[in-house]
């Protein structure tokens, strides 16, 4: 049950990260506070994505809390790294997120996946 909550948390956090990325590429830079605030007041897709991403992180924290009650931290923490994989893949597949493929990034993703698999392998008796 703890793994399920962890995977739900990872999925929601990944969606939240993608949503925030979408919003930040479309909203005015926060370096220009007045333009940024007026951009938030426009209530367009970027503003909705920003608030959806923030809400997603909040829900993800609730799921993560449930995970930590049911799963050892050493295993739960390994699940978080799957979010990097999901966001990387989604940023390349979804239009407008400007993700780029590179062999170096692919090697990093493979290392993450191998590490998670090693942590979740059953212990020898």
Curated annotation (Swiss-Prot):
<dbReference type="GO" id="GO:0009103">
    <property type="term" value="P:lipopolysaccharide biosynthetic process"/>
</dbReference>
<dbReference type="InterPro" id="IPR022832">
    <property type="entry name" value="Flippase_ArnF"/>
</dbReference>
<keyword id="KW-0444">Lipid biosynthesis</keyword>
<dbReference type="InterPro" id="IPR000390">
    <property type="entry name" value="Small_drug/metabolite_transptr"/>
</dbReference>
<comment type="subunit">
    <text>Heterodimer of ArnE and ArnF.</text>
</comment>
<keyword id="KW-0448">Lipopolysaccharide biosynthesis</keyword>
<feature type="transmembrane region" description="Helical">
    <location>
        <begin position="3"/>
        <end position="23"/>
    </location>
</feature>
<feature type="transmembrane region" description="Helical">
    <location>
        <begin position="34"/>
        <end position="54"/>
    </location>
</feature>
<keyword id="KW-0812">Transmembrane</keyword>
<comment type="pathway">
    <text>Bacterial outer membrane biogenesis; lipopolysaccharide biosynthesis.</text>
</comment>
<feature type="topological domain" description="Periplasmic">
    <location>
        <begin position="98"/>
        <end position="100"/>
    </location>
</feature>
<keyword id="KW-0472">Membrane</keyword>
<keyword id="KW-0813">Transport</keyword>
<keyword id="KW-1003">Cell membrane</keyword>
<feature type="transmembrane region" description="Helical">
    <location>
        <begin position="101"/>
        <end position="121"/>
    </location>
</feature>
<dbReference type="GO" id="GO:1901505">
    <property type="term" value="F:carbohydrate derivative transmembrane transporter activity"/>
</dbReference>
<keyword id="KW-0443">Lipid metabolism</keyword>
<feature type="transmembrane region" description="Helical">
    <location>
        <begin position="77"/>
        <end position="97"/>
    </location>
</feature>
<dbReference type="GO" id="GO:0009245">
    <property type="term" value="P:lipid A biosynthetic process"/>
</dbReference>
<keyword id="KW-1133">Transmembrane helix</keyword>
<feature type="topological domain" description="Cytoplasmic">
    <location>
        <begin position="1"/>
        <end position="2"/>
    </location>
</feature>
<feature type="topological domain" description="Cytoplasmic">
    <location>
        <begin position="122"/>
        <end position="125"/>
    </location>
</feature>
<protein>
    <recommendedName>
        <fullName>Probable 4-amino-4-deoxy-L-arabinose-phosphoundecaprenol flippase subunit ArnF</fullName>
    </recommendedName>
</protein>
<comment type="similarity">
    <text>Belongs to the ArnF family.</text>
</comment>
<feature type="topological domain" description="Cytoplasmic">
    <location>
        <begin position="55"/>
        <end position="76"/>
    </location>
</feature>
<keyword id="KW-0997">Cell inner membrane</keyword>
<comment type="function">
    <text>Translocates 4-amino-4-deoxy-L-arabinose-phosphoundecaprenol (alpha-L-Ara4N-phosphoundecaprenol) from the cytoplasmic to the periplasmic side of the inner membrane.</text>
</comment>
<keyword id="KW-0441">Lipid A biosynthesis</keyword>
<dbReference type="GO" id="GO:0005886">
    <property type="term" value="C:plasma membrane"/>
</dbReference>
<feature type="topological domain" description="Periplasmic">
    <location>
        <begin position="24"/>
        <end position="33"/>
    </location>
</feature>
């Amino acid at each position: 049950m703890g793994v399920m909550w962890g995977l739900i948390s990872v999925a929601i956090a990944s969606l939240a990260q993608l949503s925030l990325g979408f919003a930040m590429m479309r909203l005015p830079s926060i370096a220009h506070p007045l333009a940024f605030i007026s951009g938030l007041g426009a209530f367009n897709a970027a503003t909705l994505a920003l608030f959806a991403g923030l809400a997603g992180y909040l829900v993800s924290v609730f799921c993560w809390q449930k995970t930590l009650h049911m799963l050892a931290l050493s295993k739960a923490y390994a699940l978080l790294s799957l979010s990097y994989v999901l966001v990387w893949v989604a940023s390349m597949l979804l239009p407008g997120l400007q993700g780029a493929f590179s062999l170096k990034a692919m090697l990093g993703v493979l290392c993450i996946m191998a590490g998670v698999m090693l942590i979740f392998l059953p212990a020898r008796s």
